[in-house]
Amino acid sequence: MSNNQILFERAQKTIPGGVNSPVRAFRSVGGTPRFVARAQGPYFWDADGKQYIDYIGSWGPMIVGHVHPEVLSAVQNVLADGFSFGAPTEAEIEIAEEICKLVPSIEQVRMVSSGTEATMSALRLARGFTGRSRIVKFEGCYHGHADSLLVKAGSGLLTFGNPTSAGVPADIAKHTTVLEYNNVAALEEAFGAFGDEIAAVIVEPVAGNMNLVRGTPEFLNALRALCTKHGAVLIFDEVMCGFRVALGGAQAYYGIAADLTCLGKVIGGGMPAAAFGGRRDIMAHLAPLGGVYQAGTLSGNPIAVAAGLKTLQLIQAPGFYDALTAQTKRLTDGLAAEARAAGVPFAADSIGAMFGLYFAERVPTSFAEVTKSDIARFNRFFHLMLDEGVYFAPSAYEAGFVSSTHDDAVIDATLAAARRAFAALAA
């Protein structure tokens, strides 16, 4: 048995499914998860000592690569001062100022420890601000594992959602309406039917949990206009795409301002950190100023803040996003070319440093289109690439990520491996 297999068997005795987040278990693709021993730059090494090119990067945070020397130094510099205080620090102010500078729609921001905390708190705040209960989300968009958000649409346009997770009470699910992503007509119909009941619309402007699916400008502009007209709070969940698709996130990319924004991943630099923020008049409803309660013992943790602040400083280097975007596009264009040469139906897309791979004839625009991809072929491709030492997301429904350390040599090695993998698929 390999060390990975030994560790997985051992883990399953004390950890449900052997993992602390389901996608890590390889249930979608089959096989044994890789247990990471260490990482550096664009690579990680598993428990058996094998090196992999990493296109997950901790699911997005590692935009400057693993163990960047300046991020490491920033963390080391604060460790000796204490791990956690449960009291304010100057560093919390500094990272808040940096976030507000980079995302102008965020006038005030509250730090939390996870993306789920950020979205859950933003929804509570929107409900407290509006005095309404109904929220609208979109099929295929993932906003963490809070009860209100683990809901998927029924067959009808305006049906109430049914829980997609056991343990979510129907009384909670009934307040969530799920619509089709990028469907402007469905959106207009929903607002026409009950627009004045909607507390908030929460959306991934660039979805990354049904693979990569871009919000269309028409769809996102319609969201902005309808929320403004009906007094609903527009929440952009940029936990994944924030500081990934552009320096100012999706809002800078599309030129659309949200009322509230949820951030995570990059702002922690690999440490547990997230945030939600937005208009000052909405944020004023948070305790201790207002009646919407939200708290967290480790919110603004000094070690996480140090890693996040240094990462936010590094990504502001001149040309950082131009180079990162070009390198990501070089990867996806190259993969598409290799698939064409092998005669394998395949499409790829990228925006900033996020990318999607689809075993389909074209890039999807909705969850329904994503589900038409050839999942069995993706699973085989995943394992062929894994054998080659290239680690893509172990699910056909997840986006991938490139870091500033994925240089030409790394991309070339990936494309050479893909050439062999696509040839094997076509055989």
Swiss-Prot record:
Record-listed N6-(pyridoxal phosphate)lysine modification sites: 265
Chief location: cytoplasm
Cited Pfam families: Aminotran_3 (PF00202)
Functional pathway: Porphyrin-containing compound metabolism; protoporphyrin-IX biosynthesis; 5-aminolevulinate from L-glutamyl-tRNA(Glu): step 2/2
Keyword set includes Phosphoprotein: no
GO MF annotations in UniProt: glutamate-1-semialdehyde 2,1-aminomutase activity; pyridoxal phosphate binding; transaminase activity
GO cellular component terms, semicolon-separated: cytoplasm
Reaction equations catalysed: (S)-4-amino-5-oxopentanoate = 5-aminolevulinate
Enzyme Commission designation: 5.4.3.8
Cofactor(s) needed by this chain: pyridoxal 5'-phosphate
Subcellular location as annotated: Cytoplasm
GO BP terms, alphabetized: protoporphyrinogen IX biosynthetic process
Keywords associated with the record: Cytoplasm, Isomerase, Porphyrin biosynthesis, Pyridoxal phosphate
Top EC class, one word: isomerase
HAMAP family noted in UniProt: HemL_aminotrans_3
Known partners and oligomeric status: Homodimer.
Family statement drawn from the similarity comment of this UniProt entry: Belongs to the class-III pyridoxal-phosphate-dependent aminotransferase family. HemL subfamily.
Protein name per UniProt: Glutamate-1-semialdehyde 2,1-aminomutase
Species annotation: Burkholderia cenocepacia (strain ATCC BAA-245 / DSM 16553 / LMG 16656 / NCTC 13227 / J2315 / CF5610) (Burkholderia cepacia (strain J2315))
